[in-house]
Amino acid sequence: MSVIGIVAEYNPFHSGHEFLMNQARLAAKNDPIIVVMSGNYVQRGQMAIMDKWQRAKAALASGADLVFELPFSFAVQPADIFANGSIKMLSDLGVSELFFGVEDANLNFSYLGQKINQIPKNRMDFRDYTQTYATQYNEMVAREVGHEVNQPNMMLAVAYAVASEQLKNPLHLHPITRVGSGHDDPLLQDKIVSSATAIRNYCLHHPNDLSELKKYLPKGELVSLESQKVYPNWNLLFSFLKYRIESASLEELQSIYQMSEGLEYKMKEEIHTAEDFTSFLRQIKSKRYTYARLRRLCLYTLLNVTENEIKDSYQDVSTLLLGYSSRGRNYLKKIRKDVQVPIISKVDKKNAASGTLGLQVKVDRLFEQIIGEDQNFGRKPIEVK
């Protein structure tokens, strides 16, 4: 049996994701497809536009057999930690094949992963404080392996390859060339596949009429988007962030995960004059940090996620089962006794008291307040026949 894995955010699920799923299904035939998906917060430091249950439902409708939540501790992180957490989780769940979308599928990603893992860890490549870590990393990779990886999906793909090659049994990698718009294209394009960024932007600017999105979404997804009472975004959250920064002491801010190099002082200083979240980011931006890094820091601050909480969560890693098909249920029965990561089907006070699930429940409290629906307690995995 070949078990196929996909790492995803599905923010939201669109035609490009459906294309990748179809390619995976052609390869899998009757074998299971497992998706590890970010929860209600995504890698670049934002709330997802739809909750994790609706996005899992879309994946199942498109052909996934099992959808698991990637814990917050891994999901809202730079590419290397995001990849390490998701790839190890897929491996622990028995996945042997990884499908992912990239701008250039002709590269030998396994080879790139091997080469990058051979680079000494004590190098001085990342000491230039006039450039972001991401820029320095990409320059180092290009210098060492001869390929630039500065496009979003390429960077993640290389991170997947590096993480895979660190496993005892590396995954077989299957890069699939992306179709349609670029990853970060902000506007809808006259193509069948538009970027998730463009779709989110359209939802925020035209919440009362989403009919234009129909051609970019799989069947049924437009109805799901239209049923949303609110589309979570940083504009909604900025007043909460402002209160949090203004009311917290410097000592409290210093305990926040990834708060470093005096950023707490800069945030305290600039929050008073910032008109909105975008202007606040510009005011605290420096050459040292990417906007994604600062958005993540703002999210950690808003949710009061501390350095110790992240460290403690890594001592007790589990994953929440969001949904399954009949094929997925049968596969779970076969592996459940031997699986390397605890699988949670029902959240209760005991399993939510600590670890990655405990932190997930904590951070989801705000998301619940925004959308008005419970996200953990009282929920059960979605079943599709």
Curated annotation (Swiss-Prot):
* GO BP terms, alphabetized: tRNA modification
Organism (species): Lactobacillus johnsonii (strain CNCM I-12250 / La1 / NCC 533)
The principal localisation class reads cytoplasm
Q: Which gene encodes it?
A: tmcAL
Supply the Pfam families for this chain.
Answer: HIGH_NTase1
Any one GO MF term held by the record is: ligase activity, forming carbon-nitrogen bonds
**Class of enzymatic activity (EC top level):** ligase
Protein residues bound to ATP = 7-20, 101, 153, 178
Identify the GO cellular component terms for this protein: cytoplasm
Q: Where in the cell is it found?
A: Cytoplasm
Which keywords does this Swiss-Prot/TrEMBL entry list?
ATP-binding, Cytoplasm, Ligase, Nucleotide-binding, RNA-binding, tRNA processing, tRNA-binding
Catalyzed reactions per annotation: cytidine(34) in elongator tRNA(Met) + acetate + ATP = N(4)-acetylcytidine(34) in elongator tRNA(Met) + AMP + diphosphate
Q: Which family does it belong to?
A: Belongs to the TmcAL family.
> Which NCBIfam families does its entry note?
PRK13670.1 (NF010191)
- Recorded protein name is tRNA(Met) cytidine acetate ligase
EC number(s) stated in the UniProt entry for this protein: 6.3.4.-
Tell me the function of this protein.
Answer: Catalyzes the formation of N(4)-acetylcytidine (ac(4)C) at the wobble position of elongator tRNA(Met), using acetate and ATP as substrates. First activates an acetate ion to form acetyladenylate (Ac-AMP) and then transfers the acetyl group to tRNA to form ac(4)C34.
